[in-house]
Structure formats: structure tokens, C-alpha cells
From Swiss-Prot:
It comes from Dictyostelium discoideum (Social amoeba). The NG domain, also named G domain, is a special guanosine triphosphatase (GTPase) domain, which binds GTP and forms a guanosine 5'-triphosphate (GTP)-dependent complex with a homologous NG domain in the SRP receptor subunit srpra. The two NG domains undergo cooperative rearrangements upon their assembly, which culminate in the reciprocal activation of the GTPase activity of one another. SRP receptor compaction upon binding with cargo-loaded SRP and GTPase rearrangement drive SRP-mediated cotranslational protein translocation into the ER. GO terms for molecular function: 7S RNA binding; ATP hydrolysis activity; endoplasmic reticulum signal peptide binding; GTP binding; GTPase activity. One of its GO terms (biological process) is SRP-dependent cotranslational protein targeting to membrane, translocation. This is Signal recognition particle subunit SRP54. Belongs to the GTP-binding SRP family. SRP54 subfamily. InterPro entries: AAA+_ATPase (IPR003593), P-loop_NTPase (IPR027417), Signal_recog_part_SRP54_M_sf (IPR036891), Signal_recog_particl_SRP54_hlx (IPR013822), Signal_recog_particle_SRP54_M (IPR004125), SRP/SRP_N (IPR036225), SRP54 (IPR022941), SRP54_euk (IPR006325). Its main location: cytoplasm.
């Protein structure tokens, strides 16, 4: 993601505070200069940068700070809060109501990714348990209905359109009426786009808006226009009641920061950002989370929510892992669940400190996991459960049945042995296996770390992950078993961090399970004074 460059520059500016022996006005001015330059390169409006600098200066009064206060930490927290404020219009997001028809109308210029975003949004809410449908009211662009039909079929979403009716208002009204009668909960109307803003486009939007009476009108814009997003968003808002904005193509240009800050200045909330071409490449936009990931603090709350979506707490494989067992069937189930979490490179971005990680090559890790799953699918039931050994002859047969090379089968079996050894050493209810299952406490974390250090530490684990593809850079990131490289915490630091995250889960009062951990993460932010904002944890920003 090109925005990573902005994140690295901002992180570098904040880290420079640690290198100064004395914190004074000159230190603050230099910090604000570096932050301002980084934002300017991302096409953030100079007027917004000047205002942000003023806000920071007004909040940091060095001569009024009590002796003994950590000035560096306070300054970093103020900068963090003001970056959030820069991107947050302070307007609540629209949320659909379960059990009733919610009509959503999409508007935007041609080429902004509007039709693709329509399908992504329908798919997003479908995964949340809503019944969804798409109405193609774009009768202007040739091939628009074909695109909707193709996308909707791929996402398994109901759709409506017409190859003969040329009046977009009639198509929109008819489609909405059909799905309302069916009780569809989210009906998304895709409207025509243009290559430029013109009176004909705006008049058509007004007519469709009057006909379908949307609960939310979403304006889709391309992030590459940078701060010009302000004028574009303002123009559309003057014609229809735009309630939310989706900013697309955030994965491919350096103007995203400018676009987001410009839109926030219009007091219109950004509801999603598009980060790729896949159906799942649509992320809920939260200013606090966005800045957190940008600065390398990660999004553990979001990561836990993703995990909870695909891994039930009563999973048989998790129960076996908690008992120190890790069969090939366990591995198969874990791989399948990892695939459901989305591209590995995007998952890695949610882990604190990973903004320093070189970008993984596409979805290389995902492709390797798919290959492994194909191999595991070719195993017999007894082989999966560890009740029958896999001979050299069977390796050849498995390779032929899965369409893979025998070396890949051997590689997979070696990966399994590594993880089986790590998980099994803790025994029932202890060590790494119990932690993976979401159980155990700080002592368990310590035990798990000892297990891992005995097997080469984090480096040993990462070496075993290299075979999955796309994980080589991740292995480099962690350095040796005793200490983290590239600014990442060492194994000891990681154990302390996890041990101090809060005790008491269920049972023996140790590490909370997945459900409790998600609740705990959700409650880490808030508060006044030095506390985080908008649910962001009170991180030690030193």
C-alpha cells in the first residue's frame, strides 16, 4: 500500500523525539515540520496542515507541564489525536436496520470503481447476515448490466436489471419494489456515472433519489484525485443527500491521505475504503484504526474480529490443539480458516510494528496455502488423523492426486512435524497449543516462549513459515530467537506484553479466550487525559 510511505515518514518523525536529549520548542517545531512535510507529500491541503499544527501547538504547553511528566509521550499522544481529528468529520456512520428493507443508492463519476464497490458492499453485509440485492439502474454505460450480473453471480447475490428499458428511473423503481416485496434487507441501487460532473448526471440522480427514497446515498470517489476530493464531494452533496462516502483504490496511489482529509473537511463521513480488486477488499473506515495502522500500532481489535468470524470457539481442532495434539486434520482446518481471513499481506498489516515489514508479493502466501490444502484434501481419513503413516509410495500418489510436486508433499509433512513438536511439548492445557486455542495465562505464555526458544525462537518458527510462501520477509523481520529485529519486540518483551494485557479469563484466571479478548480489546481505549481516543489503546508511545 503506497500509504505505507506516509506511515513510515510519520513514524520516523515521532521516533526522532527519542533521539533528542532536551525537549523544547525547537524540538516541537522540528517535529511539526517533518509531520507537515509527510502530509504534504500525500496531497493533504496546506490549510488543513497549518490548522493541525496550530492545534498541536495550542495543546502542548511545555512550560505548564509538571515536573516528572513524560513529555515525549504526551507530545506523541497529541500528534496522534490530531491526526485522527484531521480525518474525522465527527459525524456518526449510517447503519442498516435488521428486519427491514434498507435502500442504498450509489452515485459517482465513471471510472471511480462504483459498480465494483456496489458488489463489495452487498457481499460485506451478506457476510454480516443481511439479505442483500443489487439493482442496476445504469442504462448509460454499455456493459454496465453485464458487469453487475457477472459480479453478483460471483458473490452469489440477487440482482435486477433490464436490457430493454432505457429509463434509469423506471429500472430503479421496479427493481427496488421487487426486492422490497421479497423482504430483502439491503437493496443497493447502482446509478449511471459520467466522465465529468454535468447537469444531466445530477438531474438523473435527483430523479432516481425521488423515485426510490434511499435511506443512505453513498458517493464513490477515486483516491487518486487527492485534495480535489473536496470540490467533487461538495458538488455531489449539493445535488443529492449524500450521507456516506467510499474512497476507492487506496492500495495504488500516494494521494489517499489528501483525499480522506479533504472529504472529512466536507463533514461527510467516510464509511468504507477500497483496498484492492477482491470482494473482501472493502474495509470499514475508522479514523482511529486507520491512523493506528498507518503509524504501525496495528489493529488487533480488527484482527480478533476477523478471527472470531471464521473460527468458532468450540472448534474440534482448537480443542485438540489445547490438549497438545496437532494432527494433519488440525492443520487442514487451520489452513482453511486462515484462508477465510483474507490475504495474508493484509492480515499482517493488522499486527503492531508490521508497518516496517517489506510488502509481501501479492497473495503469494495464500497461493501456497491453497496448494497445501489441495495436498491435505488428497489424504485418507486415517492419514489425516495420524492413524496411518504416509509412506514414500503414498507421497507420490498424493502428489499426483493433488496436482502438486512430491517435494511439496514432503515440505508440508515437515511443516506439520515442526508445529506438532511445538504444540505437543506443552502437554494438555499448557504451552503454545493452549495459547493457540485461546486459553492459558501469562505463565502459559512464558512456557510457550520457552518451547519456541528451544526450537530456535521466533526465528525457528518463522523459518518453518517460510515454506508457506510470502513469509520470508516476515522471518527476516523478527531476527533471532532472543531479540527482535527492525524495531519489533523481542520474545521476552512479547511475553511481558501479553502477560500484562489483563488477567482473569475463564477457568484458571489466565489469558482470556477469543471472545473475552475481543471484549477486552474493545474496552482498552477511551478515557480522558493521556488515554487513547475512539477505542485506541493507551499505548506506550515511547
Amino acid at each position: 500500500m503506497v500509504l505505507a510511505d506516509l506511515g513510515n515518514q510519520l513514524s520516523s518523525a515521532l521516533r526522532s523525539l527519542n533521539e533528542t536529549t532536551i525537549v523544547n520548542e525547537d524540538t516541537i517545531n522540528q517535529l511539526l515540520k517533518e509531520v507537515g512535510n509527510a502530509l504534504s507529500k500525500s496531497d493533504v491541503s496546506m490549510s488543513l496542515i497549518i490548522q493541525m499544527r496550530k492545534n498541536i501547538k495550542d495543546k502542548i504547553k511545555l512550560d505548564q507541564m509538571a515536573a516528572g511528566l513524560n513529555k515525549r509521550k504526551i507530545i506523541k499522544q497529541v500528534v496522534f489525536d490530531e491526526l485522527i481529528r484531521l480525518l474525522d468529520p465527527g459525524v456518526p456512520l449510517w447503519k442498516p436496520t435488521k428486519g427491514k428493507s434498507n435502500i442504498v443508492m450509489f452515485v459517482g463519476l465513471q471510472g471511480a470503481g462504483k459498480t465494483t464497490s456496489v458488489t463489495k458492499l452487498a457481499y460485506f453485509y451478506k457476510k454480516k447476515g443481511f439479505s442483500t440485492a443489487i439493482v442496476c439502474a445504469d442504462t448509460f454505460r454499455a456493459g454496465a448490466f453485464d458487469q453487475v450480473r457477472h459480479n453478483a453471480a460471483k458473490a452469489k447475490i440477487h440482482y435486477y436489471g433490464s436490457e430493454t428499458e432505457k429509463d434509469p428511473v423506471v429500472v430503479a423503481r421496479t427493481g427496488v419494489d421487487i426486492f422490497k416485496k421479497d423482504g430483502t434487507e439491503i437493496i443497493i441501487v447502482d446509478t449511471s456515472g459520467r466522465h465529468k460532473q454535468d447537469s444531466e448526471l445530477f438531474e438523473e440522480m435527483k430523479q432516481i433519489e425521488t423515485a426510490v427514497k434511499p435511506d443512505n446515498c453513498i458517493f464513490v470517489m477515486d483516491s487518486s484525485i487527492g485534495q480535489a476530493a473536496y470540490e467533487q464531494a461538495t458538488a455531489f452533496r449539493s445535488s443529492v443527500k449524500v450521507g456516506s462516502i467510499i474512497i476507492t483504490k487506496m492500495d495504488g496511489n500516494s494521494m489517499g491521505g489528501g483525499a480522506i482529509s479533504a472529504v472529512a473537511a466536507t463533514n461527510t463521513p467516510i464509511i468504507f475504503i477500497g483496498t484492492g480488486e477482491h470482494l473482501t477488499d472493502l474495509e470499514l473506515f475508522d479514523p482511529s484504526t486507520f491512523v493506528s495502522k498507518l503509524l504501525g500500532y496495528g489493529d488487533m481489535k480488527g484482527m480478533l474480529e476477523k478471527i472470531k468470524e471464521v473460527i468458532p470457539e468450540d472448534s474440534t481442532s482448537l480443542k485438540e490443539i489445547a490438549q497438545g495434539k496437532f494432527t494433519l486434520r488440525s492443520m487442514q482446518q487451520q489452513f482453511q480458516q486462515i484462508m477465510q481471513l483474507g490475504p495474508i499481506d493484509k492480515l499482517v498489516q493488522m499486527i503492531p510494528g508490521m508497518n516496517q515489514l517489506p510488502q509481501l508479493q501479492g497473495n503469494e502466501g495464500g497461493l501456497k496455502l491453497k496448494a497445501y490444502i489441495n495436498i491435505l484434501d488428497s489424504l485418507s481419513e486415517k492419514e489425516l488423523d495420524g492413524k496411518k503413516p504416509i509412506t514414500q509410495k503414498r507421497i507420490i500418489t498424493i502428489a499426483q492426486g493433488s496436482g502438486r510436486h512430491p517435494n511439496e508433499v514432503v515440505e508440508l509433512l515437515e511443516q506439520h512435524k515442526t508445529f506438532e513438536k511445538l504444540i505437543g511439548k506443552g502437554g494438555p492445557g499448557g504451552g503454545l497449543g493452549s495459547l493457540m486455542a485461546g486459553k492459558g495465562g501469562p505463565k502459559n505464555m512464558e512456557q510457550a516462549m520457552k518451547q519456541m526458544n528451544a526450537n530456535g525462537g521466533m526465528q525457528g518458527l518463522m523459518n518453518s513459515l517460510k515454506g508457506m510462501g510470502g513469509m520470508g520477509d516476515l522471518a527476516k523481520m523478527f531476527g533471532g530467537g532472543g531479540g527482535g529485529g527492525g524495531g519489533m519486540p523481542s520474545m521476552g518483551d512479547l511475553a511481558k506484553m501479553m502477560g500484562g494485557m489483563g488477567g482473569g479469563g475463564r477457568g484458571g484466571g489466565g489469558m482470556p479466550n477469543m471472545g473475552d479478548l475481543a471484549k477486552m480489546m474493545g474496552g482498552m481505549g477511551g478515557g480522558a487525559g493521556k488515554g487513547g481516543q475512539n477505542g485506541f489503546p493507551n499505548l506506550d508511545l515511547d
